[in-house]
Amino acid sequence: MPKKKSKKVKKNGKGVGGKADVHAHEEGKRNKSLLGHNAIFTPEVIDDIHIKSQLGRYRMRGMALMKKIPTFDDLVFLPGTLTRFVIEGYREKCETKTVIGPRCENPIELDIPVYITGMSFGALSYEAKTALARGATMAGSATCSGEGGMIPDERRYSEKWYYQCIQSRYGFNPHHAQLADGIEVFIGQGQKVGMGGHLMGQKVTDQVAEMRSLPSGIDQRSPARHPDWLGPDDLALKVEELRQLTKNKVPIQLKLGASKVYDDVRMAAKCDPDSIYLDGMEGSTGAGPHICLLYTSPSPRDATLSRMPSSA
């Protein structure tokens, strides 16, 4: 019987392992990629939709921003030449002292123009709050009580300390305000401008609840605006009320979440504060709607550079 011819497989032909097979494999990978991925409905977006459909509301989370934004690292310094007299860095000191509220009896003097913003005891912890107070004192800077009242040890370790007046009345103690080196009126924060505070129930311990005169173990919300003012005119009265409380001894600061910066700062200035604190979206928060944390308020850099009147 004649021998059967064996079928040869060409390595560079259409057989197994050939170029055509490799091409088909790559084409399949591309098709799979096109079918399995969408620039708008990414796997993360789809998961977010599923979670919100199960919750029946928007998602809440804390911590900082989870996307890249323009920062102050994108800016450069203009060195001195003829228009600004230069100093000899190895034998002359550079003065960084900043004075807040020079017209007050007891202005706040910072060795460096850096300030540890208000973060509540409920959002952080006793150890974190006291450590920040010690660090601010070592650096010649200041810290702030944050929402919800004063921790005695934080006040003791802080050489310069702000007491925060938030959008609600709970947690505010006029006797504690009189112990402060400055008063900060909280109007908004960068990561959730136009929204009130939200402390998750898991963080509302008995001690936190006692400080705020509220029940423990349940979510605590503060309103988006203070019940004592409905506009800039009422806010000016609140600033004057706090001046009378502190006998005009310490500076009053307004904290704004960055929005229409030019217009908001002009209206805030009419309330006659000693300083205006502008907070951008880079700052973190204890809890807030996930979508607001990502897509509201400009970055600190853009907020600082926003000097033109708004068109709206």
Task: Report residues per predicted region.
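Conserved small/polar residues in nucleotide/adenosyl-binding loops
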Residues: 295-300
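Active-site-facing alpha/beta catalytic cores
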Residues: 111, 118, 123-245, 249-269
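Conserved, well-structured core domains of diverse proteins
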Residues: 2-114, 118, 123-137, 141-142, ...
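Hydrophobic alpha-helical segments, chiefly the membrane-spanning helices
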Residues: 308-312
